[in-house]
């Protein structure tokens, strides 16, 4: 059979360029090309660049965990957000933590497996789809959950901006958003993996099973543009709440609420902008990967495919942006307090005492 005939017969996922036999391959069916054999999986898994790509997920995920812990312990109490937004941001952080732990455990396991593998059993580096299910469902649910959570935050902000009885029904709106977040994310993941074949094998649990690739692409196309829509919404909401703040100068309660809404809108603008940029990068990387994959050596293609999953970078970058936003708003708030005290307090000693009392509430 020619290379094209082998590819057309379904014995190779690409037009084969290497014509060798893979001994001790007890997984692949007879006639499978070398590129799809366990021998190629072994060569890929034991290559330094593939291990480095896997380790990059461990590094970014670990740094993301550290930043989330720092935010919770040091900055969360200073981060003034509307109640519903705070709860949904906590869900975002929960998804980031779960995703990061999943990536760390998953890739450390595969790296250890690669060092234990040998040519006498090249299929040792592969894992069953059923074995990978807990890892796959976890990171897929968290990825979808992060996108849907952003959507829920903006529904809440739109309700706050334009629904007159928002304050009265605030908790009901929050409960509806949480239910929507969990149900939609779960249904998407169940639908995507409904046709997976549990007895087939994968080189990495990060890989999507062949039977689910098209459905995952459809789900990604449908869900991730949410970040771009929300980015433009954040601009409109910031302007809306800024006008509301300027119109409430003589009502302390309304002015404080409006100021919190303005700060939260600026915070959402920065985080959503980061998310949109990362999702754009992810889309471009995935598209380029599909275009050039068949023209690359299999080890290089699989390495680039591993790197193109940028959610580990997402789980590092977004918490970092959140912390930077809190630092900026805290510094600005302290500056305003200092200016206010300088104008209102009587006498040097009185100003100093009053400033220290005001300052202590932010430390």
UniProtKB/Swiss-Prot annotation:
The chain crosses the membrane at residues 52-72, 92-112, 135-155, 172-192, 218-238, 276-296, 303-323. GO terms for molecular function: G protein-coupled receptor activity; olfactory receptor activity. One of its GO terms (cellular component) is membrane. It comes from the Eukaryota. Its main location: membrane. Keywords: Membrane, Transmembrane, Transmembrane helix. One of its GO terms (biological process) is detection of chemical stimulus involved in sensory perception. It is found in: Membrane. It is a multi-pass membrane protein. Belongs to the nematode receptor-like protein srb family. This is Serpentine receptor class beta-18.
